[in-house]
Swiss-Prot record:
GO terms for cellular component: apoptosome; cytosol; mitochondrial intermembrane space; nucleus. Disulfide bonds: none annotated. It is found in: Mitochondrion intermembrane space. Electron carrier protein. The oxidized form of the cytochrome c heme group can accept an electron from the heme group of the cytochrome c1 subunit of cytochrome reductase. Cytochrome c then transfers this electron to the cytochrome oxidase complex, the final protein carrier in the mitochondrial electron-transport chain. Plays a role in apoptosis. Suppression of the anti-apoptotic members or activation of the pro-apoptotic members of the Bcl-2 family leads to altered mitochondrial membrane permeability resulting in release of cytochrome c into the cytosol. Binding of cytochrome c to Apaf-1 triggers the activation of caspase-9, which then accelerates apoptosis by activating other caspases. Binds 1 heme c group covalently per subunit. Belongs to the cytochrome c family. Keywords: Acetylation, Apoptosis, Electron transport, Heme, Iron, Metal-binding, Mitochondrion, Phosphoprotein, Respiratory chain, Transport. The gene is CYCS. One of its GO terms (biological process) is mitochondrial electron transport, cytochrome c to oxygen. The modification N-acetylglycine is found at G2. This is Cytochrome c.
Amino acid sequence: MGDVEKGKKIFVQKCAQCHTVEKGGKHKTGPNLHGLFGRKTGQAPGFSYTDANKNKGITWGEETLMEYLENPKKYIPGTKMIFAGIKKTGERADLIAYLKKATKE
């Protein structure tokens, strides 16, 4: 998997405007990501998801995030996440490594 420190920088640059990762963190434009791994799409308590997210029915893990983060709108058509995606596999791996650590602390 990727480099946690590099992944943290990517999160700060590309994700933190809309997401938090800490336990009890607030929802912003996007949901708080604490407990992300092993959770089904559209299930963060208290966040208003699109039906597309609620109905996707996959469980978040390294493989599903790798595919989703490349092109969110292709993976979940109808998502309200406006982020275009991260094309470089290495950058996605770094971000996922960071998320894996940060969302369970």
